[in-house]
Each structure stands twice: as C-alpha cells, then as structure tokens.
A protein has these predicted regions:
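A penicillin-recognizing enzyme superfamily signal
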Residues: 1-139, 143
Length: 147
C-alpha cells in the first residue's frame, strides 16, 4: 500500500499526498508522508536505499503553504540521484513464492478483469486473495444506507 501514496488510481478514494511525484519517479519506492501545522516529512525506500526528509522550525512556528512541498521535493530528488544508474529490476523486491498478485479495484478491493480501467496490482499470501464474491465494503454500505 505504501506505493499508493503517489498512485493516481486512488484519487477517487483519497487524494494521494504525493501524486505529483508519479511522473517524476523513475524507480519504484514505498513512501509515507506526514504533515502537521509545524512540520512536514517524507520517508521512502526500496531494497537499496532509505531516504527520510523532515522540515520544520526549531521554534515550532507553522510552515507557510509553499513550504509544505519542500520535503517531498528534497526526498524525490535525493533518492532519484542515488538510484539514477540502476534499473527498476535492480532496486525493487523479488516476490516470495508464497505470495500472489491480484489486480483489484483500488476502491473496493475486489478482483477485476483485464478490461477494467482502474486496477491496482495488490499482493496477498496465497490462499488469502480476495474472491469476486467477497462482499468487502458491500455489507458496510448496505448497513449504512439501507440497501
């Protein structure tokens, strides 16, 4: 899920905080970000490198609007500089044998067909993959909206 931080497929559900980076990244990373009134941070990694950036003021004053993107920009420029001469295959993880990948709808988590426009490859321990008949959010929606 940490790659969803910059994945535009999740815009319908929740605007990914680093979606502006998706066109700038040439490698795959897991990324987490955080924000308060007084600071902002990004931490991301792949199998070769970990990069964390925090910005804020020692006197706890608030960041202004333009400063909130600083940590994100410093993070992506730094980690991409380290990885610039490596291929994606060299920097991402091999999938363990007990893990399987399933394309799912990024909102519902239900499996989708190859023709679906919005799909996200998610990984599961073999035997725990979602099935087309899994209700996922249906029960919650039915209870909340009386369907």
């Amino acid at each position: 899920m940490l790659t969803a931080t910059y994945d535009p497929l999740f815009i319908d559900y929740n605007y990914p905080t680093a979606v502006s980076l998706s066109s700038k990244l040439t490698h795959k990373y897991a990324l987490k970000s955080g924000t308060t009134y007084g600071d902002n941070w990004n931490i991301g990694f792949n199998k070769d490198v970990l990069c964390a950036v925090w910005i804020g003021y020692d006197d706890n004053r608030s960041l202004n609007t333009s400063e909130y993107k600083y940590s994100q920009n410093i993070w992506y420029k730094s980690i991409e500089a380290v990885e610039k001469d490596k291929t994606i295959e060299e920097t991402w993880y091999e999938i363990p044998k007990n893990i399987s990948g399933v394309f799912v709808d990024p909102i519902s988590g239900k499996p989708v067909t190859d023709t679906n426009q919005k799909k996200k490859l998610m990984y599961f321990i073999k035997g725990t993959e979602p099935l087309a008949t899994d209700p996922v959010f249906d029960e919650i929606l039915d209870d909340d909206y009386g369907a």
